[in-house]
Regions:
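N-terminal low-complexity, intrinsically disordered segments
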Residues: 1-63, 69-72
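Intrinsically disordered, low-complexity regions enriched in serine/threonine
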Residues: 2, 69-251
Length: 251
């Protein structure tokens, strides 16, 4: 679901080679490989079958003592797991359920699971919600329990995606309304003001014929297409802002 621009993409096996900093009395970083393995295991227990996966890392920095900074290779993990259709759960055609992962070894952000979807024709991401697994862990048992809670919330969030798709797909937009909504998305922080015209250009002349309809769903995808160029961290903030904008909130 996350689009991994500006990060170094790596295979799952490479995550095992990324060192994890030593824990302290108040903070225990979670190895990236443990996060991915536990999420895969617990998702499988729910009948979620992974169809594709991508992982990317960025370096980070840890302040160990006053005036001392240590660079940590691969400290920030971003991942995306796409799942096969879920039995008994309606999902829009041309989309697949998807989960994002964020984890850091430099305290830059908490371990979290992101729920959403991927639009197959263009690989655009759609983020519905973010669930913080935990800000610190003491054992693998705690990690498993926390991931289970996050996956429960993920499943509930994914159930609502069909309604979002139907609502946006049935909302016809005039050119004036589309322009106003795009400005509001930028104002909410989904993307910068310099992206307003490129988003409108993609909406009016879409790269994929599936989005030629003048609907809010087409505009949403024009926005997320532009957001592919953002860094993974910025995308999470951007999606969060996008979901508070009038486009996603209107009933």
């Amino acid at each position: 679901m996350l689009m991994l621009s500006h990060a170094h993409e790596v295979p799952r096996a490479a995550l095992r080679g990324i060192p994890t900093p030593d824990p302290t009395d108040t903070w225990r970083p979670v190895p990236h490989t443990d996060v991915v393995d536990v999420l895969t295991e617990r998702a499988g227990a729910r009948g979620l079958r992974i169809t594709s996966e991508r992982f990317a890392v960025l370096p980070g920095y840890l302040y160990t003592t006053p005036g001392t900074t240590v660079e940590l290779p691969g400290a920030r993990l971003f991942g995306s797991l796409d799942f096969a259709p879920i039995a008994g759960m309606p999902f829009p055609p041309g989309c697949t359920p998807s989960a994002g992962i964020r984890n850091s070894h430099d305290k830059s952000f908490a371990l979290s699971i992101l729920s959403g979807a991927r639009v197959l024709v263009c690989a655009n991401g759609v983020l519905s919600a973010e669930f913080v697994v935990s800000r610190k862990h003491t054992s693998r048992i705690d990690l498993v329990e926390s991931v289970d809670h996050a996956l429960d919330a993920f499943m509930e969030s994914v159930r609502g995606f069909q309604a979002l798709h139907e609502r946006l797909g049935s909302w016809r937009l005039t050119r004036t309304r589309a322009s106003a909504l795009t400005v509001e998305m930028a104002r909410a922080g989904a993307f910068s003001s310099s992206d307003i015209l490129p988003v409108l250009d993609e909406y009016e002349r879409p790269s994929h014929e599936e989005f030629e309809g003048r609907t809010a769903w087409s505009l949403y995808n024009a926005a997320t297409a532009r957001m592919k160029a953002q860094s993974p961290s910025r995308q999470v903030d951007g999606f969060r802002a996008l979901n508070t904008a009038p486009l996603a909130q209107a009933s």
